[in-house]
């Protein structure tokens, strides 16, 4: 995948791990499902996040009227924390802690990419992670679910090292990237 179609960096480069872009969108696409008249939040599910992200979105002010229990501050904080946690899990080569926030397809894709890194004897480092802002862009309904879409602006340092030699495979240990998802 071409991560340029999902994220933008100030230096014109792309994040070496295109799945992070997709992952952020999946984490952002928290779905609200009506179950027995009660609303319950869950991640991604079977919702097509790309279709939701490209649709004309309704303003968040309408959503807060629909779901009075919705807390925008709580969601933006959760998204920031999940972004950092996801980067940390990837670097530790153990993505199981973020499994509840991933669709089956996304988790499988991430796991396959992680296995390839392990087979090559490489570790991808994402350091000096900062979520600069989380902006809830709006919401839409898809398949009976409410899908919320957000834009995250982040700063990272992204590079890959060879596990055996410690030599730099790709990226830059010092160059900051400013990303928008």
Question: Model-predicted segments: where are they?
Answer:
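Long, low-complexity alpha-helical segments
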Residues: 118-158
